[in-house]
Regions:
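Short, surface-exposed "cap/lid" segments of acyl-processing enzymes
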Residues: 16-18, 24-70
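C-terminal catalytic histidine-bearing segment of alpha/beta-hydrolase fold enzymes
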Residues: 77-81, 176-179, 184-234
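Alpha/beta-hydrolase active-site loop
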Residues: 77-102
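Primarily recognizes the serine-hydrolase "nucleophile elbow" in alpha/beta-hydrolase
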Residues: 93-154
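Alpha/beta-hydrolase
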Residues: 36-37, 137, 193
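Short alpha-helix in the alpha/beta-hydrolase fold that links the catalytic acid
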Residues: 49, 148, 157, 171-181, ...
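Acidic catalytic loop of the alpha/beta-hydrolase fold
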Residues: 142-143, 166-170, 198-199
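Short beta-strand/loop motif that positions the catalytic acidic residue
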Residues: 155-156, 161-163, 167
Length: 234
């Protein structure tokens, strides 16, 4: 499937040099933009290009344009503020370039994230009326408890959460925590994936991970079955 790469330059107050944010764009002209945010230090493509493959899968299913980004750590900048601000910057870019990215000047946004990326989404989604659905995979508390609680309390769209029952980083209980906090959501769903760790390792769990956005954004109720999923890795 087609994709293009661009670099956004974000100015940082008090810093001589700004940040360069690489975006990978998988285009579709249906008025929907799906923004993907990986975990902390997560590469834009992920292990074995799993995020690129997942984006292609979303594009193939005609869910929307996919915009991918990395989640680097900067020693000279405060964490988690820079992680949150980078994501906001990319969302703002998507909204201001909606026609170019999605074929619609005022696009609908779906947000999906993993671990710290999911935490960031939980914190900021409620600030954007254009965001209709969010997918939180193995969500962590990296964005800060207060930010997550306030963010989810404000969000009135659809919330989809999935985590492995053997998650050794955030624990399967994180899914229930985020579910309980999303008490303003129009729809909220939680799926605990059996025999699955934090990274969704293994061919079966990779296929399940590939189907998570189909469940959240396209109503695929076969999730978390791996059947029909895309092989992301062995």
């Amino acid at each position: 499937m087609s994709q293009k790469r661009i670099i956004l330059k974000r100015r940082i107050q008090g810093q001589r040099r700004g940040l360069e944010l690489e975006l990978a764009i998988h285009p579709l002209s249906n008025g929907v933009i799906v923004v993907n945010y990986p975990g902390i230090t997560g590469d834009i493509d992920g292990y074995n290009n799993k995020y690129g493959q997942q984006a292609d899968f979303i594009q193939e299913k005609e869910i929307g344009t996919v915009v991918r980004m990395g989640n680097p750590v900067y020693d000279e900048l405060p964490y988690p503020r820079v992680m949150i601000d980078n994501f906001r910057y990319v969302i703002d870019h998507c909204l201001s370039h909606g026609k170019e990215l999605s074929g619609k000047a005022k696009p609908t946004l779906y947000l999906m994230g993993f671990s710290a990326g999911a935490s960031t989404i939980a914190a900021v989604a409620g600030d954007y009326s254009e965001v209709e659905k969010i997918l939180l995979m193995a969500p962590s508390g990296d964005a800060g408890q207060d930010a997550v609680e306030k963010g989810l309390d404000k969000f009135k769209g659809e919330v989809y959460i999935t985590v492995g029952d053997r998650d050794e980083i955030v624990g399967p209980g994180a899914g229930q925590t985020f579910y309980d906090l999303a008490n303003s959501a129009k729809i909220r769903k939680l799926v605990i994936v059996p025999n699955c760790d934090h990274q969704f390792r293994g061919e079966r769990n990779g296929k399940i991970m590939s189907k998570a956005p189909l469940w959240a954004f396209a109503g695929d109720n076969s999730f978390p079955s791996p059947d029909g999923g895309k092989k992301l890795y062995d």
